[in-house]
A protein has these predicted regions:
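Non-catalytic structural scaffold of enzyme domains
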Residues: 1-121
C-alpha cells in the first residue's frame, strides 16, 4: 500500500494519484496499485515557516517566530505520516516540493520510508 500525504495543494496530490493510476494501469481494476491519499489541507503555510515571505520568495524573513512555525508544520506533517503508517502503508510520497524541507525530521520519527523527491529526481 502506498501512502500519499497530499493537501499542499490539493491539486498536486490529486494529480499525483492520477499519474500513479495512468502509469500503473492494470488489465482489470484489481491490478491497479493500492494507495491511500490523505488530503491534509490544513497544514500551515510551508514557505512562511522556513523564513520565506510568499510575496517575494527571494526575501528571507527575520521573524523570530520561524522556529515555532517550523515546528507547527513539522507536527502537522508528522500527524499525516503517522496516520498513513498506522494504516499499513509500506512507504509515503509527499507531492509537495516545499514539504521536503522537513524530510530529515519526519523520517527520524516514523518507521516506514518517505520517498524524497529532491533526492530521487
Amino acid at each position: 500500500m502506498i501512502g500519499i500525504l497530499g493537501g499542499m495543494g490539493t491539486q498536486a496530490g490529486l494529480d499525483f494519484c492520477n499519474k500513479l493510476a495512468i502509469l500503473n494501469r492494470g488489465k482489470v481494476d484489481q491490478e491497479y496499485p493500492l494507495f491511500i491519499l490523505y488530503n491534509k489541507s490544513n497544514i500551515p503555510g510551508r514557505p512562511e515557516s522556513i523564513g520565506v515571505q510568499t510575496g517575494n520568495l527571494s526575501n528571507k524573513s527575520s521573524n523570530s517566530n520561524s522556529k515555532k512555525k517550523y515546528n507547527l508544520v513539522l507536527k502537522s506533517l508528522l500527524q499525516g505520516c503517522k496516520l498513513l503508517e498506522k494504516n499499513k502503508c509500506k512507504f509515503i510520497v509527499i507531492p509537495c516540493n516545499t514539504a521536503h524541507y522537513w524530510f530529515d525530521d519526519l523520517q527520524k520519527k516514523i518507521n516506514i520510508p518517505i520517498i524524497n523527491y529532491s533526492r530521487k529526481i
